[in-house]
Amino acid sequence: MSRRGTAEKRPAMPDPIYQNRLVNMLVNRIVKNGKKSLAYSILYKAMKDIKQSTQKNPLSVIRQAVRRTTPNVAVKARRRGGSTYQVPVEIKSAQGRALAIRWILNAAKKRNGRSMAFKLSSEIIDAARQTGNAIRKREETHRMAEANRAFAHFR
């Protein structure tokens, strides 16, 4: 086990246009092969699509989508007596937000559509309306935690 302390959590930097940390977190998850400018253009196009289709502030729609996708509990595998139990554990807000962003992006990648910007915008809109695959993933996680509630004392 490491003798060093845990690393300090660095705050996420805000993005250059909207000055928002959540937007920058999304961009950092979109980046592939170091192409951050492409990730920014994908997200900003998606935000433009959100503005056109919902007539609302895209930042508030993204916040709502992430908030509605954020899980409260998850299951962790714990070995006990030769068998593995799925133990429900509460999730901290930062970890929940990271999971929500990951689920939204994965659901957007799996969609079939024209461009990543279009797929991302439609997934964000669906998540804000509490539909879509990211919300389904959250519900599935909560169902798993509820089903394995009997093992909550194994923490």
Curated annotation (Swiss-Prot):
User: Which keywords has UniProt assigned to this entry?
Assistant: Chloroplast, Plastid, Ribonucleoprotein, Ribosomal protein, RNA-binding, rRNA-binding
- Pfam family of this protein, just one? Ribosomal_S7
The principal localisation class reads plastid
Q: Which residues form the signal peptide?
A: none
Q: Name one GO molecular function term.
A: structural constituent of ribosome
Q: Does the keyword Chaperone apply?
A: no
Q: Which InterPro entries is this protein grouped with? A: Ribosomal_uS7, Ribosomal_uS7_bac/org-type, Ribosomal_uS7_CS, Ribosomal_uS7_dom, Ribosomal_uS7_dom_sf
SUPFAM superfamilies listed in its UniProt record = Ribosomal protein S7
Annotated function: One of the primary rRNA binding proteins, it binds directly to 16S rRNA where it nucleates assembly of the head domain of the 30S subunit.
Q: Which family does it belong to?
A: Belongs to the universal ribosomal protein uS7 family.
Q: What NCBIfam families has UniProt attached to this entry? A: rpsG_bact
What HAMAP family does the record tag this protein with?
Ribosomal_uS7_B
Q: What is this protein called?
A: Small ribosomal subunit protein uS7c
